UniProtKB/Swiss-Prot annotation:
One function term, GO molecular function aspect: DNA binding
Record keywords, A-Z: DNA-binding, Repressor, Transcription, Transcription regulation
Gene: CI
Taxon lineage: Viruses, Duplodnaviria, Heunggongvirae, Uroviricota, Caudoviricetes
Protein family (similarity comment): Belongs to the CI repressor protein family.
The keyword Nucleotide-binding appears for this protein: no
Name of the protein in its database record: Repressor protein CI
Record function comment: Repressor of lysogeny.
Amino acid sequence: MKEFIGGKDVISRIMEAYGFANRRLLAEHLGMPHSTFGTWAKRGFFPAELVIRCVSETGARLDYVAYGNEPIFDNSDDLKYFHTIKLESGKSFIVENKPFLLPYLPNLDSRESYDKVFRIDEDNHTYFATSDYGNLVDGEYFVIVENSHLIRYITVLPAGKIRVDGGKFSFECELSDIDVVGKVILKMEKM
């Protein structure tokens, strides 16, 4: 039976699976104090719950995250790092690219189509959106309204109008009144 050895090594593997360069960024993503990692490393603690979460969110192999047995992912051809935007209070910030397995995304026309997909992190939601969405149809979109960057549900109305829902207030406007950046193709929520 393999032994779970905790501490610094397992934390480093978790950081690598998520694609973070330092513990502070990982802690921010996980919503925990970064000093926790220092305590775990010093005491040789094995963070089993975090290992399971990492495997679930990144698609990394359990054998790698828990024990360090390469490779990190089953099929590296299916792993892609996506440009990532963090939304906070209507403002957007570009953060480190984050990995995700392509089989978990909806099928697109071609593998090249995934180059137009980007990731959006907002509170406890993660969205994947594509800038190649063709004609506007009802659905969730990443939009800019009056310099606020938002995820909103758009309904197409007659006469070139749209209805924007999802905030405190819904409103109708011309499509040209807002900027549509991308259509959401996958939405995930952290429980």
